[in-house]
């Protein structure tokens, strides 16, 4: 997936911008307050339907204008598709391929941008949930099976946890183990493959920039030498005691 064309109107300080982009690398250079960050923000908005800087649409609309528009052309193994976003003080309108779309997920399925900003250090400083979100967004970008697998896993996890919290017979929770284990193993495999793709590049960056050996390792959330179904069964009594599932990809 590559953004190869971009049009921005009345977004932040940008009055009207039209760019043809390289599918792989683009470098934006300019003076302070010239609009570089606003341009990146517009690209992010095109793929996420939101900003990484603010939740208030009126702050993104250029002063004196009623709305902003962002249109981009995305290519991926074919002629490509046009994505569009219109933001007003009343809300956001999304179009995919010229047709109205229901949610920002329709944008992300074609163009899921990832941003590395000054807060990237929080990936190391904060808990594992932030790292899981960062990792999962990357997997979603390259693995088409990821989203349905992720949804299937979390649907089963919610049902199992609900059964555990209500304190009924163990069979009410165990009935979800097969679905949870199947989706969990598949989800972990997708994550693991993505980490394997990233690891060589990260190691090279560590050597060249820091002079250090850097390794990227994925800990999947249960014993490495054990199937998830076995771990779920072994931990059932603890799960019933605390009303939650303690092993699985959600604990990675």
Each language-model region and where it sits:
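Conserved lysine of the Walker
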Residues: 36
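Juxtamembrane helix-loop transition sites at the ends of transmembrane segments
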Residues: 31-33, 148
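Long, charged N-terminal accessory/stalk domains
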Residues: 122-123, 129-174, 178
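Conserved NTPase motor "head" modules and their coupling/switch loops across ABC/AAA+ ATPases, GTPases
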Residues: 1-31, 45, 52, 57, ...
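Nucleotide-state sensing region of NTPase/ATPase domains
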Residues: 44-130, 135-146, 196-204, 229-240
């Amino acid at each position: 997936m590559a953004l190869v064309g971009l049009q921005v109107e009345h977004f932040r300080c940008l009055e009207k911008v039209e760019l043809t982009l390289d599918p792989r690398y683009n470098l934006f250079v300019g003076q302070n307050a010239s609009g570089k960050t606003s341009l990146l923000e517009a690209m992010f908005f095109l793929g996420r339907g939101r900003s990484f800087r603010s939740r208030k649409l009126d702050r993104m609309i250029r002063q004196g204008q009623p709305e902003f528009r962002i249109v981009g052309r995305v290519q991926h193994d074919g002629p490509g598709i046009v994505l569009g976003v219109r933001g007003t003080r009343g809300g956001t309108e999304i179009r995919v391929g010229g047709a109205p779309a229901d949610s920002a997920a329709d944008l992300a399925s074609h163009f899921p941008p990832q941003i590395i900003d000054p807060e990237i250090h929080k990936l190391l400083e904060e808990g594992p949930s932030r790292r899981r979100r960062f990792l999962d967004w990357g997997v979603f970008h390259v693995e088409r099976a990821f989203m349905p697998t992720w949804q299937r896993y979390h649907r089963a996890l919610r049902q199992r946890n609900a059964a555990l919290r209500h304190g009924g017979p163990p069979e009410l929770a165990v009935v979800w183990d097969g679905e949870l284990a199947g989706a969990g193993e598949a989800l972990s495999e997708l994550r693991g493959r993505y980490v394997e793709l990233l690891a060589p590049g990260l190691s090279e960056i560590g050597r060249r920039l820091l002079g250090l050996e850097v390794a990227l390792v994925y800990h999947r959330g249960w014993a490495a030498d054990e199937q998830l179904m076995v771990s779920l069964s072994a931990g059932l009594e603890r799960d019933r005691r605390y009303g939650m599932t303690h092993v699985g990809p959600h604990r990675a």
